[in-house]
Structures are given as structure tokens and as C-alpha cells.
């Protein structure tokens, strides 16, 4: 992963994962006293941070002898991006992959998963990720040679962020980072990346991000929201809650508006959870005590995956009603 076998040509698609760029946010940060740089996980080979764990969970299971290409059936509940991270890996390695996903996730996700040859089963959106997890467990019980990768419980998830994302951010900022801002889905990114960064400098602050509508880490109740990929409605096993200094709440509407602003003002087309993370990072960077500090925010996915979602609803209608001039 990330270390090409020849100076210029990668051995296969797995060597393209990681080493994503960092870029300053310049206009949406008006009024901030701290600086904000985005880690563009939207520039992974399959356009999301989940490419890292798709690689790590499959590789880890192979090394432990739990799965064998051509024989094992991989099963996983997903909100979409982990499914895509697993699907391109499964295609490259020759695995049958069965995914369960809430029906509320974007149409692009369904199409991309099928394009990679994954089998997809939709679950009741009202049951959220819990419903997808239950369905995956049912399928595994009746499918021979099946293996659930369990992104919410799998130690290979935070481990890859500890080994790659954390060091990349530390190196990319020259060790000058003061805080990390990351949305919490499985919790793998903030747990692994955060652990590495705090080992380098214990003063680095870790800020989680969750939907206002499902603010369970702040003691609220799980509820429906529009920020695909974060706010699973339960506390995942891989999330180390003790490592987090503060979990910031951002509403679905705030997240959508910020994602739109990032495209219009920064030239960055990103998903709704990136909007949530950016909105949280800006709140932190506006605090007087953070003057001159550098915050890195993780942008988990590319905006094109959300064309059918509420993020682009008004633009889609406008585009569909256009006429030849």
C-alpha cells in the first residue's frame, strides 16, 4: 500500500492507496483565527478514506488464514464507502462479496458497488446501520465459507490509520499540527490517526464530529440524519472514546451547506460528511484560544458519489430542466 514497486508504475491498484494530499482551506475559513488544512481522502483510488480499511481488513484476514480468494465469501454491512473500498479489493483479488446497506444511501453507491461485481442487499432505512449489521449476520449464518469483516469491531480498521494516515499527517504538517478534526462513523480514523499523533505530541487535540440529530457521543438519542457515513447510532467497538477531547455536533443542513461552499469557494467537490467535518473544524478554528494554531480536518469522500443525494438536489433539478439554446 502506497509504496510502488517501480519508481513510476504501481504493481496493482492496492499500491495507489494512501499518501493523499493536504491543502489549506482559504475562503470558507473567513473569521477563523486558526488555520485549517484538509486531508483529501476524496483522492483515494476509489474516492474515499474507506479504501484504506478495505485493503487492511482483507489483507489482515488473509494473513491470519481466515479467508482465501476464490473460496471465501466476504460479507459486510456498509453505508456505502466501506463497501466500495472492499468491492474494488474483492474484484482485484477474486472474492465474492455480499454487502448489506440501508436503502437511504445514495444511488451512486448502489451502481458503483454493482459495477465492481458486489452483490447488494438493501435494508430498512429506519433501522439505520443496526439493520444492515443484523442482515449481514443473518446471511453469514446461512452462507458456507462466509466471513464478516466487521468494520465497526475490526482492529485492522484503526490499525491502518495508525500506520498510514497518522504518519502522513504528521509528516505533511512537519509536525506542526495542533488538532485533528474527524467525523465519526466506525471511529477508526480518529482512533488510529489520533493515537499516532498523540504519541508524537500529547498536546495535539482530537475533535470528533457527529450529527446533531444523532448525537449519541454527547449523550443524545440516535436519530435519522442526512450525513451519510457518520453517526451510526451506536458506539462502535473500534472507537476509543477516551482519546477524544471533544465531539462537535453539526446538523445535516449545516453539513450540506458547507459541502456546497467548499465546491463554490475552494474548488473542492466533497461529500456531506466532509461538509460536516469542515463546519466543525471552522468552529474550532474560530475560538480565540486557537489563534495561530493548525488544525487538520479529514475529508472522507468525493462529491460525485452524492449527485443523487440532497446535496445536489437543486442543481440536479436545474440541470434536468435545461434546454438547448
From Swiss-Prot:
PTM-bearing positions, type N6-(pyridoxal phosphate)lysine: 50
Gene3D superfamilies associated with the record: 3.40.50.1100
Binding-site residues for pyridoxal 5'-phosphate, renumbered to this chain: 81, 185-189, 273
Domain of life of the source: Eukaryota
Cofactor(s) named in the record: pyridoxal 5'-phosphate
Cellular component GO terms held in the UniProt record: cytoplasm
Localisation: Cytoplasm
Transmembrane spans: none
UniProt keyword list: Amino-acid biosynthesis, Cysteine biosynthesis, Cytoplasm, Pyridoxal phosphate, Transferase
GO process annotations (BP): cysteine biosynthetic process from serine
MF GO annotations: cysteine synthase activity
EC number: 2.5.1.47
Annotated pathway: Amino-acid biosynthesis; L-cysteine biosynthesis; L-cysteine from L-serine: step 2/2
Enzymatic reactions: O-acetyl-L-serine + hydrogen sulfide = L-cysteine + acetate
InterPro entries linked: Cys_synth (IPR005856), Cys_Synth/Cystath_Beta-Synth (IPR050214), CysK (IPR005859), P-phosphate_BS (IPR001216), TrpB-like_PALP (IPR001926), TrpB-like_PALP_sf (IPR036052)
Quaternary state and interactors: Homodimer.
Family: Belongs to the cysteine synthase/cystathionine beta-synthase family.
Name of the protein this chain belongs to: Cysteine synthase
Organism: Triticum aestivum (Wheat)
Amino acid at each position: 500500500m502506497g509504496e510502488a514497486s517501480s519508481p513510476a508504475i504501481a504493481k496493482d491498484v492496492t499500491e495507489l492507496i494512501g499518501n493523499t494530499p493536504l491543502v489549506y482551506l482559504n475562503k470558507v475559513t473567513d473569521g477563523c483565527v486558526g488555520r485549517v488544512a484538509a486531508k483529501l481522502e476524496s483522492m483515494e483510488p476509489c474516492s474515499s478514506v474507506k479504501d484504506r480499511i478495505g485493503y487492511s481488513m482483507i489483507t489482515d484476514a488473509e494473513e491470519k488464514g481466515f479467508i482465501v480468494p476464490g473460496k471465501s465469501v466476504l460479507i459486510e454491512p456498509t453505508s456505502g464507502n466501506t463497501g466500495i473500498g472492499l468491492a474494488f479489493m474483492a474484484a482485484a483479488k477474486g472474492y465474492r462479496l455480499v454487502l448489506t446497506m440501508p436503502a437511504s444511501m445514495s444511488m451512486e453507491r448502489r451502481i458503483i458497488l454493482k459495477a465492481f461485481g458486489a452483490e447488494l442487499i438493501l435494508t430498512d432505512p429506519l433501522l439505520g446501520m443496526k439493520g444492515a449489521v443484523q442482515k449481514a449476520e443473518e446471511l453469514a449464518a446461512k452462507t458456507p465459507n462466509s466471513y464478516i469483516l466487521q468494520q465497526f469491531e475490526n482492529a485492522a480498521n484503526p490499525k491502518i490509520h495508525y500506520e498510514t494516515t497518522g504518519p502522513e499527517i504528521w509528516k505533511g504538517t512537519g509536525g506542526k499540527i495542533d488538532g485533528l478534526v474527524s467525523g465519526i462513523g466506525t471511529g477508526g480514523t480518529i482512533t488510529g490517526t489520533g493515537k499516532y499523533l498523540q504519541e508524537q505530541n500529547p498536546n495535539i487535540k482530537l475533535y470528533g464530529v457527529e450529527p446533531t440529530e444523532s448525537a449519541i457521543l454527547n449523550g443524545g438519542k440516535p436519530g435519522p440524519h442526512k450525513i451519510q457515513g457518520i453517526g451510526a447510532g451506536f458506539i462502535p467497538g473500534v472507537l476509543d472514546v477516551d482519546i477524544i477531547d471533544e465531539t462537535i455536533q453539526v446538523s445535516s443542513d449545516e453539513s450540506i451547506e458547507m459541502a456546497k461552499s467548499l465546491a463554490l469557494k475552494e474548488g473542492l467537490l466533497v461529500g456531506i460528511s466532509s461538509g460536516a467535518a469542515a463546519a466543525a473544524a471552522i468552529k474550532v478554528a474560530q475560538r480565540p484560544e486557537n489563534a495561530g494554531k493548525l488544525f487538520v480536518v479529514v475529508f472522507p469522500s468525493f462529491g460525485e458519489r452524492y449527485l443523487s443525494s440532497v446535496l445536489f438536489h437543486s442543481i440536479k433539478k436545474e440541470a434536468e430542466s435545461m434546454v438547448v439554446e
